[in-house]
Each structure stands twice: as structure tokens, then as C-alpha cells.
Amino acid sequence: MEKTRLTVLQEMWLFIIVWVGQLIALIGSSTTAFALDIWVYDRTGSVTQFALVSLFNTLPLILISPIAGPLVDKWDRRKTMIIADVLACLGTIAIGVLFVIGRLEVWHIYLANTFTAVFMAFHTPAYTASTVLLVPKQHLNRANGLMSLMFGISLIIAPTLGGVLLTIVHLQGIILFHVTAVFIAFVSLMLVRFPEVNTSAVATAKSSFLSEATYGLTYLIARPGLLGLVLFSASSFYIVGGINVITIPLVLNFVSVSFLGTILSLFGIAIVAGGLLVSIWGGLERNIYAIYGCMLLSGVFIFVAGLQASLVVFTVGIFLFFLTQPIVSSSTQAVMQNKVEPSVQGRVFAIKGAIEAAAFPLGYITIGPLAEKVFEPLMATNGSLAGSIGQIIGVGSGRGMGFLLMIMGVLTILETSIAYLYPRLRFVEDELPNVNAVAIAADTASSKNDAVSLIS
């Protein structure tokens, strides 16, 4: 067993070096984002302006990703990550300078977030597409589990660390911490050399920029199984967005704001636990079955979370829901990495990222109003459903959101059942050949197990 674990570490060594650097950078950026959120809300007291901070973080990613994908496929992916990390950090540095000289305004943060998000639109597909170059096929699920783990760790650490640092070193100290974190990520990338991608004829053929920008979508449409997988994956992002917008007001029906952070941290721990589980376990040989199974369980857990007016039931249900999400995301990534040629992964993953990024805020803007304007009035003490469904699940504040969660759970189960009946998706791992760079990655890993490959 010990020898097996040592072998796994040796075969994933280069990926782990990059992963550690990116984890530290993500903690730095997430801590800064938390601090800026607090600054905006304290400065304005406006929920709308607070929400706009997230919008300016997300919208550029959706708009720029189709353009970034073709460029990522043409550029060296390691250098793309380095340049994107450094340039994105410049926006944070500008915020720090403006804060120190006392000239920082809310619109500066919107602008800086937009600036940063543009470069992250290049960084994300470059990082995702690099995984298959650094990791042998049998460890792709582990690598993707570590990537889920990375986001879970940042979700737990950033709010706590941000709160402490705001008190001790204030905003300028947090920005200095962010710059230091990016420098560490820069060093980790400088220590490794990524294998070169063998550009296929289709990838190198001359074409218009518009066709290049839409190539990722065209590629998916030509492979209905992969398109179905991306849309199925995006539905989980939509659900997460909906749960996020419901969680805070629903939990505040039971506890104070001071205890809310503890509940949210538990959900972050669930993501970390799920990521660790995948990293250690390695996932099922048939990834699509892991996706189906976890999505089905997700629906059950969401349904249970809304079933009673109980903080314990809600917390356990949503905790278990978030526990399944790293398995869904890592298994989805593994299928995509196995079935999409490395030379076009930048374009395909950019489109995938844009679709998923759009699904998340869509959950916010649809589930939130539905909960507030439709379901809460229906389940009020004198609401239209108080005498029927209300007799089963209760009435009053929060019960409308609970009922909406139950409906989301049922729809998730129904969606999963329909997805299972779609043969192109169910047999996607059989019908499409494996085209990843396993040989390149394996050769590279085996030749560099004893030492980190320095840039020549």
C-alpha cells in the first residue's frame, strides 16, 4: 500500500508542484475578494452594489472565454498561466495603491475585478488543459479531485483568514499577502516544464478568428455525448447557485449572523472532504456512472434539506450535497480530458467554462426571486398552500424556500433519469476514443520523477 502511494506521488509529482502554487495563489485571491466584499458593503450598505462585485468577476469570464480558448491552444500553456497570474495581480496591486493614498472608490473595484477576470479567462482553460499533459490517465480523477479540493480549501480558509488579516494588517496587508501568494505560484510554474502538445491538422488549419472562437462549441455539437455531459455538468452549477442564494436567508431563520459563518464553513469542509475522497480513491473506472450516481444522490439530499423546518436537517442535507459535487466535477473533467484532443482542449474547456460560469449566476437570478416572490408567499401562514402542503412541511418564514428546495431535488432526480436514458451521454466513454496525451504525460513523468525539471 505504501509503495503504491509512493508510486502515485511520483507519477503526479509535476502536477502537485503546480497545484500547490495554484492553491496558494487561490487562497490569496479569495482572501482579497472577501476583504473587498466587506469593504464595499461597509462603504455603501447596498446589497446591489455588493452583488455587482460578483457580477464583474463572472461576466468577463463568460464573454472572453470563447476568445481566450483558441489563443490558449496556440500558446504555451505554462507561459499562459504565468502571464495571466502576473497580469491579473496588477489589478489587485492598483487597488492597494489607491487604498493607501486614500483614493479608492467602489467603481475602482468593479474595474479591477473586470481586469482580473479577463486574464482568468485565459488562465482557467490553460490550467485545465494542462492537467492531461502532467498526469497519466489512471490518475486523472485524482488530479481533478485535488482541483476540487483546492477550491474547497480556499472556501474555508479565505473568510477566516480575511477576517483576521483585516483586523491586524488591514486591506493593504491582505493585498501584500495576495501578491506574495501569486509570487509563490509563479515560482512553482517556473520550476516545471510542460510537455509540448502535438498540434493536430484540424487545430492548425488556417481559419477565421470567428470560426476559431466558436470551434469549441462546434466540436461539442459534433459530439452530442460531450455536449450532453457539459450541459448536465452545468445544471449542477445552476443548482449550486440556487442553493447559495437560498442558504443565507434560510439559515438566518434559525441562527444569528455570527453562527452563519460556521454553517457556511461546514459546506466548505464538505467540498474538501469530497475532493480528498476522489484524490485518495481515484474514482470509478466508468466515470459516467459516478456522475449519474452522485447527481441522483444530490437530488435526494436537496429534497431532504427542504423537508423540515430544522437547521440540522437542512445542514446535513446540503453538507451531503456538497460532498458529492467534487465527484461530479472530477469525473466530468476526466471524461472530457480523455475524449478531447489536447491540441483543442483550450477551446473546448473555455466553452465548457463559459457555459458553467453562466449557469451559476443564472441560479442566483432565477431561484432567488422565485423563493422571495412566489414560494415564500405561498407557504406563509395564510398562504395558498398553507392548508395543503403546509400541513406536511410546515408554514411560515423559510418554508417557501424549503418547498423550493424539495422541488429542486425532485427536478434533479428527474433530470438525472432523463440523462441516463440519453444513449449518447450514457455511452460517451464507449463511443468516443480516448485521445488524451497519456503517453506524453507518462513519459514526461517517468523521466522527471527524481528531480523537478527546470526551464532550460
Name every feature range the model reports, one short phrase each:
Residues 2-15, 195-231, 440-454:
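Juxtamembrane intracellular "pre-TM" segments in multi-pass secondary transporters
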Residues 44, 76, 98-103, 307-309:
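Helix-breaking motifs and short loop linkers at transmembrane-helix boundaries and internal kinks
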Residues 11-19, 47, 103-106, 110, ...:
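Primarily residues marking transmembrane-helix entry/exit sites
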Residues 102, 129, 133, 175-206, ...:
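Helix-loop junctions on the cytosolic side of multi-pass membrane transporters
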Residues 16-36, 54-72, 76-91, 108-167, ...:
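Substrate-agnostic recognition of the 12-TM MFS/MFS-like secondary transporter fold
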Residues 32, 41, 94-99, 116, ...:
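MFS-fold secondary transporters
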Residues 53, 63, 80, 94, ...:
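C-terminal transmembrane bundle of multi-pass solute transporters/carriers
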Residues 34-48, 245-258:
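Short amphipathic helix-loop junctions that connect adjacent transmembrane helices
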